[in-house]
């Protein structure tokens, strides 16, 4: 499974519905679980800044991640941005692989 991060900004009219926030959030999560049962949520945070929420979740592929984003946009999000997260150890492995290739290519000159 791949790790994804979803940053959302709610539409202004939805942001004003503070008393209904828990219900709206539960409805969104239930819909995602129904439409994307393969997605596993890891963390959910409310943010102070340009985005309202950050979700960290695992999904098998980019198509599943796109569905989560589209469900968010169809249910009150004004903006949704999905990022793929690479585990740090895996990232370090990529840097070693690239370094070897760069070194090999530079010796070809």
Question: How should these model regions be labeled?
Answer:
Residues 29-53:
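Short, glycine- and small/hydrophobic-rich beta-strand elements in well-ordered beta-sheets
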Residues 51-54, 83-97:
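Short secondary-structure transition/capping segments
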Residues 14, 44, 82:
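Glycine-rich, flexible loop/turn motifs
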Residues 5-9, 45-68:
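Short, well-ordered beta-strand segments in beta-rich or mixed alpha/beta enzyme
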Residues 1-37, 89-109:
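Short S/T/G/P-rich N-terminal loop/turn motif that feeds into the first structured element of a domain
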Residues 59-89:
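An amphipathic, aromatic/His-enriched active-site/gating alpha helix that lines ligand/cofactor pockets
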């Amino acid at each position: 499974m791949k790790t994804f991060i979803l940053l959302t900004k709610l539409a202004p009219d939805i942001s004003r519905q503070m008393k209904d926030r828990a219900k709206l959030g539960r409805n969104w999560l239930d819909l995602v679980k129904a439409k994307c049962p393969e997605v596993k949520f890891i963390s959910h945070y409310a943010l102070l800044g340009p985005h309202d929420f950050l979700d960290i979740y695992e999904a098998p592929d980019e198509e599943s991640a796109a569905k989560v984003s589209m469900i968010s946009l169809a249910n009150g999000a004004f903006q949704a941005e999905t990022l793929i997260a690479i585990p740090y150890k895996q990232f370090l492995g990529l840097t070693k692989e690239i370094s070897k290739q760069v070194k090999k290519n530079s010796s070809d000159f």
